[in-house]
């Protein structure tokens, strides 16, 4: 029998700011990731879920080279990257990790607003102080992800947004479905008396 144990971690990366403390915060974030990778054993199935506050992009199926260059990404992520996303993508590639949420198409409409899991609701002032000068950004981004190791990716059945959400939040709920056991059916060896009786009863 295959021995499997799960190492599940929650992650939150600091949002990109011009504050001087951001450099220290993001360095601490990656140091914690390094420690987590070091704690992992061969038997561990590592699952990291959280808000990474980074646009990592997607492997466009038209650009085949991108699939080879960035194996950490699938073809169902949102296009567009930023500096934080490029750094995170390169880190995941170096550690042989996979952003599972970019490999699966949602069961409903697969347009960018559906793939996205965060909508910017911040108010932007265009100028002046009248109410008409304040607008909602309204842009959608894919910031929340589930990350797994490449060796365990075959266990993942689905990772992505859910169809319905019962809570009010600017973040869309995402889920990960994983295969734990291939076959739990008990094998009858013919030695158990109760099993033999049940087998005869079923034949009758």
Q: What residues fall within each predicted segment?
A:
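Intrinsic-disorder/low-complexity, polar/charged segments
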Residues: 19-22, 82, 203-204
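Feature marks short, surface-exposed loop/turn motifs that line or immediately flank catalytic pockets
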Residues: 15-17, 56, 182
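Surface-exposed cleft-lining segments at the edges of enzyme active sites
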Residues: 13-25
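Metal-dependent phosphoesterases centered on the DNase I-like endonuclease/exonuclease/phosphatase
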Residues: 28-151
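A short acidic, often aromatic-flanked loop/helix-cap motif at beta-alpha or helix-coil junctions
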Residues: 17, 105-111, 166-168
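Surface polyanion/phosphate-binding segment centered on an Asp-His-Pro turn
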Residues: 1-6, 10, 47, 138-204
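Intrinsically disordered, low-complexity regions enriched in proline, serine, glycine
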Residues: 20, 58-59, 100-102, 156-159, ...
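Active-site-proximal loop/helix segment associated with metal-binding centers of metalloenzymes
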Residues: 8-15, 70-75, 202-204
């Amino acid at each position: 029998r295959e021995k499997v144990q799960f190492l599940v971690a929650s992650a939150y990366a600091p949002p990109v700011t011009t504050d001087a403390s951001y450099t220290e915060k993001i360095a601490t974030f990656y140091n914690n990731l390094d420690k987590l990778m070091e704690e992992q054993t061969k038997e561990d199935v590592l699952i990291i879920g959280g808000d990474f506050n980074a646009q990592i992009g997607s492997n466009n199926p038209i650009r085949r080279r991108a699939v080879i260059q960035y194996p950490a990404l699938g073809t169902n992520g949102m296009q567009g990257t930023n500096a934080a996303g490029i750094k995170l993508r390169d880190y995941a590639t170096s550690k042989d990790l996979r952003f599972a949420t970019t490999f699966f198409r949602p069961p409903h409409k697969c347009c960018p607003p559906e793939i996205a899991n965060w909508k910017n609701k911040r108010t932007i002032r265009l100028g002046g102080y009248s109410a008409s000068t304040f607008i909602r950004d309204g842009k959608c981004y894919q910031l929340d992800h589930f990350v797994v190791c490449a060796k365990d990716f075959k266990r993942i059945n689905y990772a992505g947004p859910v169809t319905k959400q019962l809570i009010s939040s600017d973040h869309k709920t995402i889920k990960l479905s994983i295969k734990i056991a291939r076959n739990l059916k008990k094998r009858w060896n013919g030695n158990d008396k109760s099993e033999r009786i049940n087998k005869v009863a079923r034949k009758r």
